[in-house]
Swiss-Prot record:
Binds 1 [4Fe-4S] cluster. Residues 1-275 form the UvrD-like helicase ATP-binding domain. ATP binds at residues 8-15. Its cofactor is Mg(2+); [4Fe-4S] cluster. One of its GO terms (molecular function) is 3'-5' DNA helicase activity. Heterodimer of AddA and AddB. Its EC number is 3.1.-.-. This is ATP-dependent helicase/deoxyribonuclease subunit B. The heterodimer acts as both an ATP-dependent DNA helicase and an ATP-dependent, dual-direction single-stranded exonuclease. Recognizes the chi site generating a DNA molecule suitable for the initiation of homologous recombination. The AddB subunit has 5' -> 3' nuclease activity but not helicase activity. PANTHER family: RECBCD ENZYME SUBUNIT RECC. It comes from the Bacteria. Despite having conserved helicase domains, this subunit does not have helicase activity. The gene is addB. The lineage of its organism: Bacteria, Bacillati, Bacillota, Bacilli, Bacillales. It comes from Staphylococcus aureus (strain NCTC 8325 / PS 47). Keywords: 4Fe-4S, ATP-binding, DNA damage, DNA repair, DNA-binding, Exonuclease, Helicase, Hydrolase, Iron, Iron-sulfur, Metal-binding, Nuclease, Nucleotide-binding.
Amino acid sequence: MTLHAYLGRAGTGKSTKMLTEIKQKMKADPLGDPIILIAPTQSTFQLEQAFVNDPELNGSLRTEVLHFERLSHRIFQEVGSYSEQKLSKAATEMMIYNIVQEQQKYLKLYQSQAKYYGFSEKLTEQIQDFKKYAVTPEHLEHFIADKNMQTRTKNKLEDIALIYREFEQRIQNEFITGEDSLQYFIDCMPKSEWLKRADIYIDGFHNFSTIEYLIIKGLIKYAKSVTIILTTDGNHDQFSLFRKPSEVLRHIEEIANELNISIERQYFNQLYRFNNQDLKHLEQEFDALQINRVACQGHINILESATMREEINEIARRIIVDIRDKQLRYQDIAILYRDESYAYLFDSILPLYNIPYNIDTKRSMTHHPVMEMIRSLIEVIQSNWQVNPMLRLLKTDVLTASYLKSAYLVDLLENFVLERGIYGKRWLDDELFNVEHFSKMGRKAHKLTEDERNTFEQVVKLKKDVIDKILHFEKQMSQAETVKDFATAFYESMEYFELPNQLMTERDELDLNGNHEKAEEIDQIWNGLIQILDDLVLVFGDEPMSMERFLEVFDIGLEQLEFVMIPQTLDQVSIGTMDLAKVDNKQHVYLVGMNDGTMPQPVTASSLITDEEKKYFEQQANVELSPTSDILQMDEAFVCYVAMTRAKGDVTFSYSLMGSSGDDKEISPFLNQIQSLFNQLEITNIPQYHEVNPLSLMQHAKQTKITLFEALRAWLYDEIVADSWLDAYQVIRDSDHLNQGLDYLMSALTFDNETVKLGETLSKDLYGKEINASVSRFEGYQQCPFKHYASHGLKLNERTKYELQNFDLGDIFHSVLKYISERINGDFKQLDLKKIRQLTNEALEEILPKVQFNLLNSSAYYRYLSRRIGAIVETTLSALKYQGTYSKFMPKHFETSFRRKPRTNDELIAQTLTTTQGIPINIRGQIDRIDTYTKNDTSFVNIIDYKSSEGSATLDLTKVYYGMQMQMMTYMDIVLQNKQRLGLTDIVKPGGLLYFHVHEPRIKFKSWSDIDEDKLEQDLIKKFKLSGLVNADQTVIDALDIRLEPKFTSDIVPVGLNKDGSLSKRGSQVADEATIYKFIQHNKENFIETASNIMDGHTEVAPLKYKQKLPCAFCSYQSVCHVDGMIDSKRYRTVDETINPIEAIQNININDEFGGEQ
């Protein structure tokens, strides 16, 4: 029973001395007494390789490299193990979650948190922490008895003690945790003859838990010898750099005193690891109180990058230089990090440079398609077949892998489901999924082609197969009563899905293709799933449980599954965290993310028990818990020290100025400290360095091409670019080995969104030999030719969703107003409040069920929206009544359609126009309302258009002039052409072109006293004032509002009179009859010009910018045209917005059917 302690700073040869001793003993007596090297889990593989690869040893039967848990198993093999079943991490988590749910009503502080998955995880960690530090429920109960304790702390500890005690009772005599197995190991030590003959070495640790100290105590007591290696100078000062390992030494000294043995200390002072003076000086002076500056010889570098991505790209380039120029191997290099954001960057960037690497971290299995399928399947049952988990389940492609183009079929199914609002048990309604229903998907109904029918039949078959599997699963689970029943039902369901065969086939294919890591993942997924089922049966067995609770507990278990990947090769870069990674004697170590906030890292308490509660508990209960935040904060310098002393050749520190979320970052104060130790140790700004040394960017062929692209793009924009980039382009272009993909990059370099003008034949194939179109189609072309091409040429459709769109709301208002107008023959004056409500209810009952497959009755929200629509309609009718009371114009026709060949007598005829290519233009559409007034055998007509959007309820004559707003002039033209079909007199003249804004008006008041009910109603009515353009003819003016008189401005039409009875400029929007006719004829010419441009094949990405706004803001096709202000701004079209449109139209000569030149 001897105890040795090898003490010294990093790189002084402590571990080398240990390995040399072990090697000498093994050479002297290969089959002698056992030698046990205890190391952290992360180090065991590396140390085993050291013995295996030693040419003088070639392995050993005498020496074993173990961590504490594996050592315990070694002892159990000799003396016998415990009879209890050992709980896995997942089994422990599931058991504690179930206990928390059962005990929820008894909890005092955590009752509301108990339902969340994360709470049981925190509670499990706290209980495991207690066990590591030998704190029992009895300790907690004794501590809780303290009358001076705060109520919140008392309630917290009572809750934890309740769950902890219940957990201990559940596992008593039946199960054992990993921490308890270590306690059993301690009890077994005296029985082990093997241990009594063993020489023990403990290396690689900087701190231990209470249970681990007890193990060490047992080893010292029963083993032949124990040697512990610690990185410390022996200084017990709590503010020393080596506080943490010195604390370990203090504990070992206490153990030695208890056992009445002395510690044979051996101090190591000579530095052996470092190959140069830079690293020696860095190690010796890092914690020095008085700085001794020396010249840096180039073995320490500090890199500053703009972003984290740029930082890792630079590290990758420098690794290539290490391998190529310095003749290092990948296994000679290590990367250490602390910010978890870097893990993703390693995976995304290092493969681009063909750098083999292994990250010493475990990845969760939850994002694997198989796990996502299972968790989505669980959620489908839990949520009663809601659409989101169903779609996630389908998109995993696990249950649909047997279908060709399954992803495409699932995409079509998703379109249909979102359009029809399929949820809940509607998934089971075969009638809803009739193939004929797919003919209407995202478009007007049309007859399915044979190919479309075959495709949609496959969609329906796929959906039915998946539903059958889910129903089978649901039925099997619903018949289960105990946990064992549930586990059995789940496994049998997976077999029914043929999941095992599917996974094994996929694994074999991956292995055959050399993708061994992915193949290994498949194995671990299936084994992990079976392990969770086994754990459930082990822990709960025949215990009754509801299906809901079982699925919750099962999901908790799935959350704990992690991939444990074995390195695929020995020659690879080692990547790990600064806190846990065990890398030693690497030629080059890169420490990335050296920012303030990461190194040092603010340490905050994340456990259920706060730092203050820990300290109070330790004092009162005389126990030791895990270190508090302030203690851990003191050890940050030691973490940095250990990380940077792992190298023996070079150390590169790097940091970025911007975080992963775009936040500003500062340099680590440790780097400032390191920089102060050396003269001429400058921070290298990476962008500036590359600007001066462009060749440093050319380390990898593929990545050089990408950087070359950026350089050439800068050159095209007249920026100064180094000649070496032009040389690099020529080399790559002329090399058959390197020029793959170069043409693609060059085409991207000159990409400018320029479209190809369609030929005459293709234009006719796309648009037909005649143009049959609505007014909005021509307006859409004027906004942007490409928008028209995408919608009417390519016929691209947006995914239709089961939700109310703005245009749906407009259609509802139009339909409701048409229904009511026809019922009352347009006589709004006769309406009273009772009649308004009655007609509104009738109209809504008739119309709303037809909107989007009865959408407005699908949920409480939409039913509320229906009532809101009803309220808007009632207010609108009140406004129409008010307007009708003071107008001589009478509404006569509602929702009147027009086209070239009317299908009924009620429809109007639209005159055919002709393009410059001789192609007929047939305009079709629907006029919301036509009001008429007849006097002296002359009929005057008003066009009334209902708008539910305020932005579109305005007639902008500048837009009319330029063909951007064509609707109202077209409607007036159609009405003037159809006087006989409308039953008008021989002489018909325009009255007004007016918009009616259907909306829910709001009135602002400064104070409550301003509110008057009668005035409020009047003000609301005024909010519905018509806007647009009115014929300045006195007969029209008098008929529009019979109240008009001098100094009066109408509140129903845009007309006002001055004091002398003339039309006021401020309150009137009027034009004379000839001007209106000119606008109408000019509108026709805009139709001809627009249609001619369409048939000419214009498809340019050329939006029309008007009043500093682009139509792109609300365009559905941006993802297709990739409009970009930098690329396309030169093609933005503009118009002269300063013109007076009425003066402009009066100054042009127009030939028309109204009487020659005007």
